[in-house]
Regions:
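C-terminal segment of classical bacterial N-terminal signal peptides
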Residues: 11-25
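Bilobed "Venus flytrap"/periplasmic-binding protein-like clamshell domains
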Residues: 30-62, 72, 131-198
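Pocket-flanking alpha-helical
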Residues: 47, 65-116, 190-195, 201, ...
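Signal peptide-directed extracytoplasmic domains
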Residues: 98, 102-142, 146
């Protein structure tokens, strides 16, 4: 008899818990934050935001003063990056996304890759961190600057990513296309370092804050890679011609084996949304 009562009590507790969870789920508002590759900073940023919101929601559910008045549940899946996130927000599939400030500008103004697809309702929520655009090269490739990429195997980034867009902007400013390289790849940010360490590519371009764990891996693996300088009148022209670009420097010693400063240009990582998303959620 005691066993029956104990079992019945357990069932009732589980049932009560499920009702409680169902009530919370029904009252919660779900939304999605687009991020980037699973090893990148955007993915970490999106999931950190979700974690903070979940913690706040749990506090409120338990009657704590610092909790939110309304329960929010969010997901932050790995995605193709900046332009993909903006496109999904425009389509109403995502409510938020992390994106480079340059692609935020182009989407709002209908320029560059967003020509004919203007997204005037795109809004910035806040900036996260600075992101220098870095071109990394393996040591044996002997690449010192952009001209040294001629005849090399270069990863230009996956379609829809911020790194792909910025690389194409830089190539356009330099007056070159894909034929300038021996060949190009379209690897994601999470794939490119392994490809370099395995000797499959000579170089890649990437917009990312520093220091970065994946870049340190590129510096310490068999590639012995390091960031190169991006300077000259063409790069300065990009900086002078756009408010979202600025000169950036990766100080020497940031990465293993980096003996000199690497001068380049950079943008900011921003969390963006749509004007159609309710103010209460933002």
């Amino acid at each position: 008899m005691r066993k029956i009562i104990t079992s019945l009590s357990s069932v009732l507790l589980i049932f009560a818990a499920s009702l409680s969870y169902t009530g919370i789920a029904k009252s919660a508002e779900f939304f999605t934050i687009g991020t980037g590759g699973p090893t990148g900073v955007y993915f970490q940023t999106g999931n950190a935001i979700c974690k903070m919101l979940h913690k706040s929601a749990i506090s409120a559910e338990h009657g704590r003063k610092k909790g939110t008045a309304k329960a929010y549940r969010c997901t932050a899946p790995s995605t193709g990056g900046s332009n993909y996130n903006i496109g999904q927000i425009k389509a109403g599939e995502f409510q938020f996304g992390v994106a480079q400030s340059d692609w935020q500008y182009h989407a709002v103004n209908g320029s560059s890759k967003w020509e004919g697809k203007q997204f005037s309702n795109l809004r910035a929520v806040f900036s996260v961190h600075n992101e220098p655009f870095q071109i990394w090269a393996r040591k044996k490739a002997k690449i010192k600057n952009f001209s040294g990429l001629k005849g090399k195997v270069v990863n230009i980034g996956n379609p829809g990513s911020g790194q792909r867009g910025t690389m194409e902007e830089l190539m356009k400013a330099m007056g070159v296309d894909n034929s300038f390289f021996k060949s190009t790849t379209e690897l994601t940010s999470s794939e490119q370092v392994k490809a370099m360490c395995d000797g499959k590519i000579d170089s890649f371009g990437y917009s990312v804050g520093f220091p970065n764990g994946a870049m340190e891996q590129a510096a310490t693996c068999a590639a012995k890679a390091s960031p190169i300088n991006l300077t000259g009148k063409e790069v300065q022209g990009l900086i002078d011609g756009a408010d979202y670009y600025a000169k950036a420097v990766i100080p020497k010693g940031t990465y293993t084996g980096q003996k000199k400063d690497a001068t380049t240009l950079g943008v900011k990582a921003t969390v963006v949304t749509s004007a159609d998303v309710p103010d209460e959620l933002v």
